[in-house]
Amino acid sequence: MTDAHQADDVRYQPLNELDPEVAAAIAGELARQRDTLEMIASENFVPRSVLQAQGSVLTNKYAEGYPGRRYYGGCEQVDIIEDLARDRAKALFGAEFANVQPHSGAQANAAVLMTLAEPGDKIMGLSLAHGGHLTHGMKLNFSGKLYEVVAYGVDPETMRVDMDQVREIALKEQPKVIIAGWSAYPRHLDFEAFQSIAAEVGAKLWVDMAHFAGLVAAGLHPSPVPYSDVVSSTVHKTLGGPRSGIILAKQEYAKKLNSSVFPGQQGGPLMHAVAAKATSLKIAGTEQFRDRQARTLEGARILAERLTASDAKAAGVDVLTGGTDVHLVLADLRNSQMDGQQAEDLLHEVGITVNRNAVPFDPRPPMVTSGLRIGTPALATRGFDIPAFTEVADIIGTALANGKSADIESLRGRVAKLAADYPLYEGLEDWTIV
């Protein structure tokens, strides 16, 4: 085909010519990510290699089934890729079994529950209002509709999970599955204690490590794998990979978990995403990745310390549990004149993206909330070091301490300098996706 014919053929037209509206929105999102500071705890930036894998010709390939047992021909190359992803996941986390096909963390969690319980069985997880996840039993979620749900919570004084309460509820309710994991909780969980309680009541233990999997991979967070029957995770939070899920388990659950993913929850896997997972899991075994996770933790600790300073306290700002063990800080605004929505909007004005989040025993409605969930993974990926994290922590602390009286222009200028000092995706426009 001649160049002239290619220019008129939609198969060869670049995105900015064929669909300028979509191209402009993507360019706008790239500018937003570059020019602002991303501090939503569940977000991160994937490396060039992951963008290339996910934007590859693998998007064309259907591959229902598993390596060596596909329902379609032509799967030789995708079999290699899926085997790489499974082997890397098992090696990284010390697991006996891995399934890398789930399209998302929620899909992975649905498959886990399909494996460990029957509809109508009782499951027990951390209350959504106290930091749990939708898929751990929220009444409007599939997990709340298909299963009988009981919840444990945090102690009203310490704001930490009380293992005595967990045991008391488990003994009374006799759940089929106990879930350890969270979406907004700043401390380690005691996986050994959860295992002991599960064994005592004859329950299966499932740990959802979506938020802290990267820390586990780096050896900077206790691993749930030795204590759990099944572990699930997303790949895009602290692991810093594509938006997708994985499942790890003891070998005895392999056959049922595979069946629960396909055909139980999904048809064909997204092989471009599986390739991106494989690449992300390779990166997660490097020393550079471990350094990034260490800076993630240090950044969160610096932020927690700044938000407990005298000016923040005077403005009614507090930090849930008084600090953090992980990649996020939960700012408690119950005694502040600002609610979570107002605080989120204020930080958005200065160029920092966070999300409002309910705190335990929150008196405000869930769309308003009395808290902020602030995370450091994306900034660590961007290259932030201790001085940079100290600066962004001070920007946030100053903004929350001053509220509507904050000097927005001054704070925005400080954010802009940090964004310029730690550039993101340099040369992206020139990268070739193959």
Curated annotation (Swiss-Prot):
The protein's Enzyme Commission number: 2.1.2.1
Transmembrane segment boundaries: none
Essential cofactor(s): pyridoxal 5'-phosphate
Reactions listed under catalytic activity: (6R)-5,10-methylene-5,6,7,8-tetrahydrofolate + glycine + H2O = (6S)-5,6,7,8-tetrahydrofolate + L-serine
Residues with PTM N6-(pyridoxal phosphate)lysine: 237
Enzyme class: transferase
GO biological process terms held by the UniProt record: glycine biosynthetic process from serine; tetrahydrofolate interconversion
Chief location of this protein within or outside the cell: cytoplasm
Alphabetized GO MF terms: glycine hydroxymethyltransferase activity; pyridoxal phosphate binding
Pathway assigned to this chain's UniProt record: One-carbon metabolism; tetrahydrofolate interconversion; Amino-acid biosynthesis; glycine biosynthesis; glycine from L-serine: step 1/1
Cellular localisation: Cytoplasm
Binding of (6S)-5,6,7,8-tetrahydrofolate, residues: 128, 132-134
Taxonomy, superkingdom: Bacteria
Positions marked as site (Plays an important role in substrate specificity): 236
Role description: Catalyzes the reversible interconversion of serine and glycine with tetrahydrofolate (THF) serving as the one-carbon carrier. This reaction serves as the major source of one-carbon groups required for the biosynthesis of purines, thymidylate, methionine, and other important biomolecules. Also exhibits THF-independent aldolase activity toward beta-hydroxyamino acids, producing glycine and aldehydes, via a retro-aldol mechanism.
Family that this chain belongs to: Belongs to the SHMT family.
Subunit-level organization: Homodimer.
UniProt-recorded name of the protein: Serine hydroxymethyltransferase
Lineage: Bacteria, Bacillati, Actinomycetota, Actinomycetes, Mycobacteriales
